[in-house]
Amino acid sequence: MSPLLRVLNRTSLVTQIVIGLIAGIALALLAPAIALDLGFLGKVFVSALKAVAPVLVFILVMASIANHRHGQETHIRPILWLYLLGTFSAAVVAVVASMLFPSQLALSAGDVTLSAPGGIGEVLQNLVLSAVDNPINALLNANFIGVLTWAIGLGVALRHAGETTRTVVEDLSNGVTLIVRVVIRFAPLGIFGLVSSTLAQSGLDALLGYLHLLAVLIGCMLFVALVMNPLIVFWKIRRNPYPLTLLCLRESGITAFFTRSSAANIPVNLALSERLGLHEDTYSVSIPLGATINMAGAAITITVLTLAAVHTLGIPVDLPTAVLLSMVAAVCACGASGVAGGSLLLIPLACSLFGIPSEIAMQVVAVGFIIGVLQDSAETALNSSTDVLFTAAACQAQERRSA
């Protein structure tokens, strides 16, 4: 083995990612032109993760259910409740923060031509239609709701198959997992390319005009990540939640921050769940499910930007409306993965609660795209790290009760 490979094997992946991050920042500041050219490293890494994620979820969930033995327990229901509780709590935090530190937006008359869903019913309808999508189409377009539906259906059907068939499915699962491990080893190079090209292309100039709004958004996400989520985890596992919380933020959140894709971070979360020794039948389903419906960061984005528009227009907000907004934001956030453009294009839906016309609401969406470099990164980091955090908390709570 060459000396370089020996050093790489001895150095942890997180350390390598931090080195790649620092090198990317340095290159963007010193040689922006070269940094832009090296952006293809990030594109290749994200494309590889996105390519392998649907296949991984499909094979892993199908294998997990097909090889599930009678008497084995999975803990999906408590994890699902944690996802919903975490998303609603995040929306409440965002409402409180927006009331304490109201943001103002410079809304102009410029037209923004984007297509947003017309109501909550349409979002839910899109989710149902995604669930019954053609399986090949679902895999090609990374429709994880459709992929999960077909994986669960085939898994249940194959539970009655012969032992040989189930062994083949398990071997396929192991093969795909090995490919994912190889892809993840290239994370430092990918993040180096992503950071260097993003900073060289956008810089930080575009963000300076929205510092207050960004401070409220990022502050809410940090509060949820470092206070609310640990409180929920403590309630579940009844011991110091911070070692687990910080581990998930370090191992999952950092990668998600730079890939800006919950789907692309699924392999990272699955690998972390395996290292934590969690129940495979549980995490192989809960992690892809979390990437679809566990959207605390999206709930914060929808709430903060909606209330920023409300404060800018001078619309009064009473307590019942604030509570309703929290509920709507939580439901919309759960449907964010079913909408192209994610949480930002669901803002007009929340704005409709206050009678804000679509033209103004879409200007708020445009503001969201301007600050998206940081907003989307922080949102994805919170969403994705919470998937593995709540999965680990539920599994550890079950182990504590069984002991």
Curated annotation (Swiss-Prot):
GO-annotated molecular function: neutral L-amino acid:sodium symporter activity
InterPro entries, alphabetized: Na-dicarboxylate_symporter, Na:dicarbo_symporter_sf, Ser_Thr_transp_SstT
Principal location: membrane
A Gene Ontology cellular-component term: plasma membrane
Source species, domain of life: Bacteria
Membrane topology: Multi-pass membrane protein
Record-level GO BP terms: serine transport; threonine transport
Alphabetical keyword list: Amino-acid transport, Cell inner membrane, Cell membrane, Membrane, Symport, Transmembrane, Transmembrane helix, Transport
Gene3D superfamilies found in the cross-reference section: Sodium:dicarboxylate symporter
Annotated localization: Cell inner membrane
A Pfam family of this chain: SDF
Catalyzed reactions per annotation: L-serine(in) + Na(+)(in) = L-serine(out) + Na(+)(out); L-threonine(in) + Na(+)(in) = L-threonine(out) + Na(+)(out)
Bilayer-spanning residue ranges: 16-36, 45-65, 79-99, 138-158, 175-195, 214-234, 295-315, 327-347, 353-373
Role of this protein: Involved in the import of serine and threonine into the cell, with the concomitant import of sodium (symport system).
Family: Belongs to the dicarboxylate/amino acid:cation symporter (DAACS) (TC 2.A.23) family.
Record-given protein name: Serine/threonine transporter SstT
Organism listed in the record: Pseudomonas putida (strain W619)
